[in-house]
Amino acid sequence: MSKHVAVLMGGLSAEREVSLRSGAACAKALEAEGFRVTTLDVDRDIAQKLAALRPDAALNALHGRYGEDGVIQGVLEMLAIPYTHSGVLASALAMQKDRAKDVLRAAGVPVAEGVTIGRFEAAKAHVMTPPYVVKPLGEGSSFGVIIVRADQTHPPQELTRDDWAYGDLVLVERFVAGRELTCAVIGDKAYGVTEIRAADGGWYDYDAKYKAGGSIHILPANLKEFVYQNVQELALVAHRALGCRGVSRTDFRYDDTPQGTGELVVLEVNSQPGMTETSLVPEIAAYAGISFGELVRWMVEDASCDR
């Protein structure tokens, strides 16, 4: 009898639409691999649904709050349902950008200087000399991220809006010029390094990430060999330092601009990276000869409650 897999998707976070796409792609691939699949759009009665369903494993295709921060992982452990990706602690750490940076810094991973501050304080005066970046502490997919440019005289007033939905604390972080790089870790091995560019030459924001034709992926990234290897090594160190399991993706900035310093810093570790067939991790896996079906099969076979 084929293994029964519950694909958890949708959810209650700002990244709901991205998660629905990840979940649908994973469910389709698992069915093609011979698994019996039930898709669950996660809401506040998910524990009851899972208890009634009793799947053999759960593939976590959730992104953002409640799905990527240790909450759903705790529910699955309480119900003794093996699940994919990282466990409770690693998920919570990776989702909280300031806490993750503390752990990475202690492990010797280079990160950009930053400070955690209330959003209203960050809107009163420049916290640091521009350019800098303002990020919500616990969101992904670039939701709520603000770039404060070098010529910007006033701090970002978007932070004071009544409809701000990303929490009252923000991370203000020094802007690092140069290229955006990313590296996937699958199991305990770092795979290919991709350079990501917004198709319009601008910032790699939500539209660039998820709209058709919004970004250009260069795989393998055109880097000197020692830089390429350094990215892979740091991705693996970051994955291990946070205690990640299964699949993760670490994002970097590399300053090789004409006046640059050659600085390479980790921006964040994604413990629940996008999982559509054209997302970065499946693309990197395919470059290594791992099909999307093989990837999701491995993820389910790797699922456990000891993460």
From Swiss-Prot:
Cofactor descriptive note: Binds 2 magnesium or manganese ions per subunit.
Catalytic activity as recorded in UniProt: 2 D-alanine + ATP = D-alanyl-D-alanine + ADP + phosphate + H(+)
Positions that bind Mg(2+) 1: 251, 268
Cofactor(s) listed: Mg(2+); Mn(2+)
Disulfide bonds: none
Keyword annotations of the record: ATP-binding, Cell shape, Cell wall biogenesis/degradation, Cytoplasm, Ligase, Magnesium, Manganese, Metal-binding, Nucleotide-binding, Peptidoglycan synthesis
Protein residues bound to Mg(2+) 2: 268, 270
EC number: 6.3.2.4
Cross-referenced SUPFAM superfamilies: Glutathione synthetase ATP-binding domain-like, PreATP-grasp domain
Predominant localisation class: cytoplasm
Residues engaged in binding ATP: 128-182
A GO cellular component annotation in the UniProt record: cytoplasm
Pathway participation: Cell wall biogenesis; peptidoglycan biosynthesis
Molecular function via GO: ATP binding; D-alanine-D-alanine ligase activity; metal ion binding
Stretches assigned to the ATP-grasp domain: 101-301
Function (record text): Cell wall formation.
Family assignment from sequence similarity: Belongs to the D-alanine--D-alanine ligase family.
Record protein name field: D-alanine--D-alanine ligase
Taxonomic source organism: Methylocella silvestris (strain DSM 15510 / CIP 108128 / LMG 27833 / NCIMB 13906 / BL2)
Lineage of origin: Bacteria, Pseudomonadati, Pseudomonadota, Alphaproteobacteria, Hyphomicrobiales
